[in-house]
Amino acid sequence: MNPDRRADILDAAATLILERGYTLTSVDDVIRGAGLSGKSQFYHYFPSKEALGYEVLDRQFAWFENHGLTVLRTPGVPPLERLNEFIDALVAIHRSRECRTGCPFGNLAGELSQAHEGFRSRIEVVFERWATQLQALFWEARMELVQDADAARLARFVVATLEGAILVSRVKRDPESLEEIAADLKRFIGMHVRGRMPAVVSRAGAAIQQ
């Protein structure tokens, strides 16, 4: 089994699913996108379209966890500043795409959560693992936060707000709406800081704007 060919199939499927959605992406589309000779070659690597879709989702979250979420764990940087940098980086990614693709996890959730239990349960885990990392960050920042700040609820709120903001900006094809909601999210978090409100724009955000 050729690992490069397998990766080609996953890459083609990920691109097509992001552009069209899972339902409108056929095995034939993936075969053409990956440059395969036919269905026998596809089924040599994946037993079904469903199995391929699961692996695409798993691989996308692995990348997000190992690259996108690493800023939340940057040593030597205060936790709330790390959160601001993460938000700024997420906004920058979607601005670079003109807010046309959306989030692969949010897209699949909207498309399949009512129709496909296998995908629904996997996407639920994706959001839970993302929120868990944010919860750890808020727990680390607990001495900066007001006494009644709930790390778990703040983490879930951040995930829900960012996913909603990405969806709205995709519908409007307007990066400014994403930036505005991200700034409002930072202000909301700032309301939970003892005696001060952190800057809306972090070091990473200032660098992005330059």
Region locations from a protein language model:
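Generic hydrophobic, amphipathic alpha-helix propensity
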Residues: R5-A14, V30, V56-Q60, F64, ...
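Amphipathic alpha-helical segments used for helix-helix packing
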Residues: R82, R97-S121
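Amphipathic C-terminal alpha-helical segment
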Residues: I93-S96, V159-E176, F188-P198
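Hydrophobic alpha-helical segments that form the core
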Residues: G106, D148-V168, D184-F188
